[in-house]
Amino acid sequence: QGGFTAIERVSNILDEPIEIKDQVSPKFSLLENQGSYIDDTIKKLEEQNFITPLALGEIRFENVWFAYKDDDYVLKNLDFVIRPGEKIALVGPTGAGKSSIIRLLCRLYEPTKGRILIDGIDIQEIPQIELRRYMAVILQEVFLFAGDVKSNISLGDNYTSEEIESAAEKTNVASFIQELPEGYNTELRERGTNISGGQKQLLAFARAAIRNPQILILDEATANLDVGTEALIQQALNQLLTGRTAIIIAHRLSTIRNVDRIFVLKRGELIEQGSHQELISQGGLYATLHNLQMLGS
């Protein structure tokens, strides 16, 4: 069940509508049973024959255009490289295209034009199960299902107790779990209503850590912190980011001052990029958004 990761929750939570998928790409229609059977068979053969060459975490968008329908492009001629281990923040107003970039990277959709490569390989050539082992997504709204703690970390994959506990230790969630009535066997309610928002966030980090992904995608994963776990979360996040490529969808610009580069999007176009200080000095859209947030706080 290696394919079941947080990626499968992205389409329910990220902000742009995705119900039109079947209209845009008829090959996904459930009515086309024969085509689906053939596609599934080909996919299984691809997965058997695919030798994983992914190891670095380089992401490359080559002249990527994307429209959910017709020629109404929400991404326009995106052309950039994210180097292995680099931390990038995506910034822009609502509807700028931040979520669409993540959807394409997770292969919830394919580019209308152009291509996306990971470590030099077109992601359309990478079986989804491999892509999802290589990439972890951590969202603002952490989805927990009714079940014990260890199952909420492993998501049904065959990890040992030692591996689960090691992931919990690395992400500062072990001490909280040990205080629960039955430790890792404690039953959580659906959506984790019997634990705090910060504790849910730490469990999401443990989910990512156990899979040891090379690429992390975070949708402002530190947006809803409670005071009791804020320091633990920041420490766990710093450790999780070490040595990995990361893309952060930023809503609070104060949280991304230390990333390597900031990509500023407007109406699907990449209009600015640079460090926090470089973009402030340029006095463009990023500087305007930053100053507005500072005034608001």
What are these regions (language model features)?
Residues 1-15:
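Cytosolic ends of transmembrane helices, especially the final helix of ABC transmembrane type-1 domains
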Residues 15, 22-23, 28-297:
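ABC-type nucleotide-binding domain
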